[in-house]
Amino acid sequence: MSDTEDLAALNDRLMAKNHALAEALSRAGKELTKAKSQLAQLAQPPLTFATMVKVDSTRTDEDGIQHASAEVISGTRRMVVPVASNVNAARLTAGATVMLNEKLVLVEQRDADTVGQIRSVKQVLDDGRLIVTDASGNPVLIRRSGALAYAGINQGDRIIIDPSVRLAIEALPAEGDKDLVLEETPDVTFADIGGLDSEIGRIRDAVQLPFQHRALFERYDLKPPKGVLLYGPPGNGKTMIAKAVANALCEGGYDSNGDGAISPAETHVKGVFLSVKGPELLNKYVGESERLIRLIFQRARERAADGNPVVVFIDEMDSLLRTRGSGVSSDVETTIVPQFLSELDGVESLDNVMVIGASNRVDMIDPAVLRPGRLDVKIRVGRPKTNQAIAIVDHYLTDDLPLEDGVDAHALSAVLVHDIYGTSERRHLCDVQEENGQWHALFLADVVSGAMLKNIVDRAKTRAVKESIETGLDVALTVPLLAAAVEDEYRETRDSMADVDPEQWSRINGMDPIRRIRTAE
């Protein structure tokens, strides 16, 4: 190979290496640029969140450049900071979230924060400022944000405040009636309740008559009762009666203007049923339970303003309105009871509003609540007698169920009830010692309730269903099947008596105080 050819080959190799080096250099340059960009991004100082209070000053120079400053709150610091020229100061609103750079210059505005502490409005001042209460009940005076400048805010409303506790930044929707008002009308009617004809008659007289015959009540200068108390041992229909009242109220047809006649328009006037569970109103924060009571009666007054009858039903009333100074709970009742009483018969009228309470322990309710003029009508819903028990069982043992040929459902009900109410040894639960030291026998009939009667029938039906599954045929409800259900209920009740506290058990079940219980073998 000649020298010329050698030089040409060397030149080709060098050119190839040169291209490779150039490509490597180009890649290295790109990687270096990328690294510098990442380094610059990582070296960028952080921005600080702050809450906008107001624009402090603003002007525009001869070159059209904006010079503005704004008052902001960052954490606990209240500052006046410059506003960057590219941020329109006219669009800065109180309560909005703004960003500050490392030199504390306002460089960006964002939407107001949607989270924060929730406070209740205690008072709205004439100038629009708000007095709110914190978790301990202490009042704090705050201003409104721009978004709430013209918003209608009332006492008791809930708002979100900024971290500095200086600005109200958002109003929350009012706690809806869905927590207090039955969204659906209960399907229980008075016809569905057996064995309580006397009690039903009394509560219908107290609740329905004043609204259906308003003119007659005015003619006789008779004021409707403010409240009704349903009390007695558990499981005997107090809540069912309240549901039936709700159903009857929602049927409509009330004399709303007191002219003594129900016009076609008034047939559409329907009552409102506010259902409240007593324990739900108890709150560990000072003043919160009282606020909820005020809210309930405020809702009731609003609904009753158009002449609609309103019933406020408070279940487990003894848990909410306990005797003050009784020492059986915290001191929360010392403020809850006066608040309830002030709402019931205070300065503000409660026209068209009636309170119905239900309790197993009437002895624990403050006497001031029970006096005439407050809960005027007191209805004891006691344990059913034999005839009442048969009427109750008739609602669950009907002729459309699988029965033996020639067997009447009412006759089965009578047999079932007579078995339950027997006083032989086979229905003996235990012996109890009263406070005077005397012992006497306690039978299943002494603790029977409407709920227990339904449970016994359900036991028999469950046995029939299981036997029907095994045999593939409809098994009739027979006397032996019902007797077995009674026996199961008796055994469970007898066994549970060994673990109860005698005094508490006797009070809850509406009996005379019991010192000791001696269970049957």
Curated annotation (Swiss-Prot):
Signal peptide: none
A biological-process GO annotation: proteasomal protein catabolic process
Gene3D superfamilies: 1.10.8.60, Nucleic acid-binding proteins (2.40.50.140), P-loop containing nucleotide triphosphate hydrolases (3.40.50.300)
Recorded coiled-coil stretches: 4-44
GO cellular component: proteasome complex
SUPFAM superfamilies: P-loop containing nucleoside triphosphate hydrolases
Keywords, alphabetical: ATP-binding, Coiled coil, Nucleotide-binding
Record Pfam families: AAA, Prot_ATP_ID_OB_C, Prot_ATP_ID_OB_N
Chain positions recorded as ATP binding sites: 235-240
GO molecular function: ATP binding; ATP hydrolysis activity
Subunit structure: Homohexamer. Assembles into a hexameric ring structure.
NCBIfam families: pup_AAA
Family to which the UniProt record says this protein belongs: Belongs to the AAA ATPase family.
Protein name: AAA ATPase forming ring-shaped complexes
Protein source organism: Bifidobacterium longum (strain DJO10A)
